[in-house]
Regions:
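N-terminal hydrophobic/helix-forming segments and targeting peptides
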Residues: 1-147
Length: 147
């Protein structure tokens, strides 16, 4: 069965989006993009900063087009390991705590391990916390609970 362009694009997007690529860890995503374009027959190379440059060709050198996209995702960096074992984060990029609440996260350790957890309000029990709905979401009031 022949795939349509939309199916192909969706499949490629799912594959690329499945690659963890927080700021500073974009090499694997960049390599995926590089190989994807090479498999389509395009010349692709990496830049000094780790970006991917692809020449799509064309006959008029004075009528070019540049398309740029980020391969990194917004995220957080561990600012503190609390006495409870939970993690206080600080933002990387423009990540806002209210946008990440209740999201699953992966923490990359210095030794290369990946530990999963959940980013949530420090007092996340709606049964006990009467101020849950009104609580300000910030990196001081939210934390990562490790699995």
């Amino acid at each position: 069965m022949e795939r349509t362009y939309a199916e192909y694009a969706a499949h490629q997007a799912v594959e690329l989006l499945a690659i963890d690529s927080p700021t500073g860890f974009t090499r694997q995503a960049a390599e995926w993009v590089l190989n994807a374009f090479r498999s389509l027959g395009y010349e692709a190379r990496t830049t000094v900063k780790g970006g991917v440059l692809i020449d799509l060709g064309g006959s008029d050198e004075n009528d070019g087009l540049l398309l740029e996209a980020h391969a990194d995702t917004l995220g957080g960096m561990v600012a503190e390991i609390k006495g409870t074992g939970r993690l206080r984060l600080t933002a990387l990029g423009g990540m806002r705590p209210e946008n990440g609440e209740a999201e699953n996260v992966r923490v990359y350790t210095r030794s290369g391990r990946v530990i999963e957890g959940t980013f949530q309000l420090c007092n996340a029990s709606v049964h006990v916390n009467g101020e849950y709905a009104n609580a300000k979401r910030s990196y001081d009031t939210c934390e990562v609970v490790l699995d």
